[in-house]
Each structure stands twice: as C-alpha cells, then as structure tokens.
From Swiss-Prot:
N6-(pyridoxal phosphate)lysine modifications at: 314
Positions of substrate binding: 201
Protein name: Serine decarboxylase
Expression induction: By nickel and manganese ions.
Tissue: Expressed in roots, leaves, flowers and siliques.
Species assigned in the record: Arabidopsis thaliana
Known role: Catalyzes the biosynthesis of ethanolamine from serine. Highly specific for L-serine and does not attack D-serine, L-phosphoserine, phosphatidylserine, L-histidine L-glutamate L-tyrosine or L-tryptophan. Decarboxylation of free serine is the major source of ethanolamine production in plants and ethanolamine metabolism is crucial for the synthesis of choline, phosphatidylethanolamine (PE) and phosphatidylcholine (PC), and thus for plant growth.
Length: 482
C-alpha cells in the first residue's frame, strides 16, 4: 500500500503534462459527468406515515474523487525547467474558466456573485487573524479589528441597538451565527427548551444536538412561516421550563418570514415573562434585505430579542463564507472568559477568525451604503415577481412569499437539469433565489430551457405533480387545480 502511494506521488512531469493535454479541452471539475449518478438514498421526504412506499429517493452528488487533482512532489530539476509551475498555471486557468461558466447558470442558492474586490488584492499577502474578542486587541498584531468593529457598528445601527449595549463578531459562516445565538440562550437558560419551526435551517437542529438541548419542532403554515397556534400548544405543555426560540427571517426553502411580533405575543400570552425566554433571529439572507423594504415588519433590538445573525456571503456578496452575529452586552457575560495566551477575552465559537472577511464587508458597505442596498433589494423583489409570473404563464405551479425573493416551483424531473442550473430541491419542489447577480436575461434563459425540457419530460402524456400540499391550491396549476 505504501509503495502504491509513493508511486502515485512520484509521477513524472511528462506524465502530468500528458494528463493536462488530455484534459485541456473539457477540464471541468464541477460539470455533470455522463457516468451513472451515485445510488439513491431514502431521506423520508413525503414518506407515508402508515409505512407505505411513499418515500422519495434523494440522489447524492457524485464522488469528487472522480475529478480530484493530485498533489505531487516537485522534481529535482523543476526550478530550472519550470514545468510544474506551467502545469499548475494551466490547471488554475482552466479552473477559472469553469468558475466563469458555472456562475452563468447559478440560480438555486442565495449567493450574490456580482462583486469586484480588485482593490483588496494588495491585502492578500498578509495572514490576517482576528482571534479573540473583536473589541479587545490581542498580542497578535496582524488583525483587522478596526474594520470588524466598524462593520458591527453598522449592523448595530441597522438593528437599532446602541454601541455600548451590544456585543458581536464577524463569524465564519451563517451556521456559526446560529450556533452562537442558540448557545447564548442555552447558557442563560440551561434547562430551557429550544423551539424552532420545521422549516428552520438544519444548523438550528445541529445546535440542539451539539448542546444536548431538548428541542420542539413547531409546525408551519403553507407559506413556511411558523404556526403560532402550534407554538402556543407546545409552550403551554412546557410552561415550567424557559423557552429558547429560533425565529426565521427567511426560511431556507420557501423564503418565509416568521411573524416576530406574533411570536412575542404568543410567548407573553402563554405566561412567559421577558426574563424567561430568549429569541434568536436567523436572518441569514433576509435579515439584511428586510430593513430596506418599507412595508416589512422590523427586526430590532427595541423588541425583546436576544440576538440576530446574518450571512455576509449571501446578499452582501462577500467572496468567502462569513456572517455577522450581534447579541446584547448583558447576555454575553455568560460566555466570555479571559485567555492569557491571547492577552484578550473571548466569547466566540471559533478560535482563529478570518481577518480578511471584515475588509470585504467594510469595503462593500462603504461602497453601496443604505441607498445602494435599497436599490438592490427592490431589483431582487421585482425580478422575483417577474420569474413567478412567467412560470405561471408557462403553466408551471409557482409560489412567491411576500417580502421574499425565493421563487418555489415544481421540481424538474431531470437531475442533470437540476445540476446544470444548480437548483436547490426538497421533495417535489425546487426554488430559485433571486439575488442582485440574477438578471432578467438569466431568468429568461432559464425559463426557455425549463419549458423546452418539460415538453420532453411530459411528452408521454404524464402530468406534472400536484403541488397543492406544498404551495397551496391558489399557487398550484396542476390539472386538478387549474
């Protein structure tokens, strides 16, 4: 076994170049290959509760080992020949071409791919690490804390909390914001029960498992919004324990916004005083969009919430995953501890934190400002309505929640089509998330491709699935609900 590994790692440069030549025309590590897809696994979506055969099969993504790029040892004379450098440059050039092509057909995930951070290229030569508390400088001097705190202050103003009353940090992703917010709630109420709607992001239930929390999954309305009648029943059944709630400011699949005011009212009517509940608002995508919609309800610390998190790589358009988590200063004491090694305090989830992300966020917040984001939000909502209307005109069931840019429609029958357009699917539905980088032209290309393929999928006379149970009868235009 060891011998085979060594032989793999000592491939001659001639062999590498030969392989590169073979790949030169169609090198695409992310393309859908013609080889059979991996075997399906059952995920239970749509399962028959009576034990019948109603389970839906989920197709996993292909094994990346089929397209992995080997790491090989440089040859002794490589510094003179430069073959290895030329090989790597060619691979990277082709990979860049792949990224350009894949970006053209990106629709299903909430990432804004329209950005230009060329001005920050000069800072990529530094190992910038914001370990520890953002507000206290550590012994490690290569950091970007002034930029990070500037970004945090901007979000504090957005969510209406005074500088001296909040604590927060720039996270490595949206999930970390949820993990931190729920952890603060758990530390405040060690015996508290976590309540989250069934359509909450999977990271919320991951947090419950990690922290060994009792968790109640609350039913949702057709829109995907939390059902406060079901929440009331579950709260009344557990009145003896504090409540820790996850409130969705945009659910993952349907883009539904939980009614924060109704959630608070339900808690109060069930006898939970403000010192017996903690609310974390998962605003991964819409937490930054809603403040710029005039008719949208406010997410604000003027209400009895404990924390808000938002992703930085989604609507903002940061090129690396990151996020912002803000909580009340009075709450963070339950997590904070002194770290002599850093000469600082720490209440974050991670140790080392990406010091480049604050630079990108600071740069784009300064360039766009409130007015710039407002224009982009209006564009996204307008284009989302355009897509929904065109789908309905084409005879395709579609739903768009108010305040949302997530358009839900019937799941395409062909997994290759799903992968080509990078659609997110669940059960019989798929969705497109309209971001600032999604243009009318891109939507028209998608619609044209979808309509063309549907003619093929249903040419045998079969009918598209009824989506009434997923999107409601008003949005379903299957033969039974036209």
């Amino acid at each position: 076994m060891v011998g085979s590994l060594e032989s793999d790692q000592t491939l001659s440069m001639a062999t590498l170049i030969e392989k590169l030549d073979i790949l030169s025309d169609d090198f695409d590590p992310t393309a859908v290959v013609t080889e059979p897809l991996p075997p399906p696994v059952t995920n239970g979506i749509g399962a028959d509760k009576g034990g019948g055969g109603g389970e839906r099969e989920m197709v996993l993504g292909r094994n990346i080992h089929t397209t992995s790029l080997a790491v090989t040892e440089p040859e002794v004379n490589d510094e003179f020949t430069g073959d290895k450098e030329a090989y790597m440059a060619s691979v990277l050039a082709r990979y860049r071409k792949t990224l350009v092509e894949r970006t053209k057909n990106h629709l299903g995930y909430p990432y804004n791919l329209d950005f230009d951070y060329g001005a920050l290229g000069q800072l990529q030569h530094f190992s910038i690490n914001n370990l520890g508390d953002p507000f206290i400088e550590s012994n490690y001097g290569v950091h970007s804390r002034p930029f990070e705190v500037g970004v945090l202050d901007w979000f504090a103003r957005l969510w209406e909390i005074e500088r001296d009353d909040y604590w927060g940090y720039i996270t490595n992703c949206g999930t970390e914001g949820n993990l931190h917010g729920i952890l603060v709630g758990r530390e405040m109420f060690p015996d508290g029960i976590l309540y989250a709607s069934r359509e909450s992001h999977y990271s919320v239930f991951k947090a419950a498992r990690m922290y060994r929390m009792e968790c109640e999954k609350v039913d949702t309305l057709m829109s995907g919004e939390i059902d406060c009648d079901d929440l009331r029943k579950k709260l009344l059944a557990n009145k003896d324990k504090p409540a820790i709630l996850n409130v969705n400011i945009g659910t993952t699949v349907k883009g539904a916004v939980d009614d924060l005011d109704l959630v608070i009212k339900t808690l109060e009517e069930c006898g939970f005083s403000h010192d017996r509940f903690y609310i974390h608002c998962d605003g991964a995508l819409f937490g930054l969009m809603m403040p710029f919609v005039k008719r949208a309800p406010k997410v604000t610390f003027n209400k009895p919430i404990g924390s808000v998190s938002v992703s930085g790589h989604k609507f903002v358009g940061c090129p690396m995953p990151c996020g912002v988590q803000i909580t009340r200063m009075e709450h963070i004491k339950v997590l904070s501890s002194n770290v002599e090694y850093l000469a600082s305090r720490d209440a974050t989830i991670m140790g080392s934190r990406n010091g480049h992300a604050p630079l990108f966020l600071w740069y784009t917040l300064n360039r766009k400002g409130y007015k710039g984001f407002q224009k982009e939000v209006q564009k996204c909502l307008r284009n989302a309505h355009y897509l929904k209307d065109r789908l309905r005109e084409a005879g395709i069931s579609a739903m768009l929640n108010e305040l949302s840019s997530t358009v839900v429609f019937e799941r395409p029958k062909d997994e290759e089509f799903v992968r080509r357009w990078q659609l997110a699917c669940q059960g019989d539905i798929a969705h497109v998330v309209v971001m600032p980088s999604v243009t009318i032209e891109k939507l028209d290309n998608f619609l044209k491709d979808l309509v063309k393929h549907r003619l093929i999928w249903y040419e045998d006379g079969s009918q598209p699935p009824c989506l009434a149970s997923e999107v409601g009868t008003n949005n379903c235009i299957c033969p039974a609900h036209k």
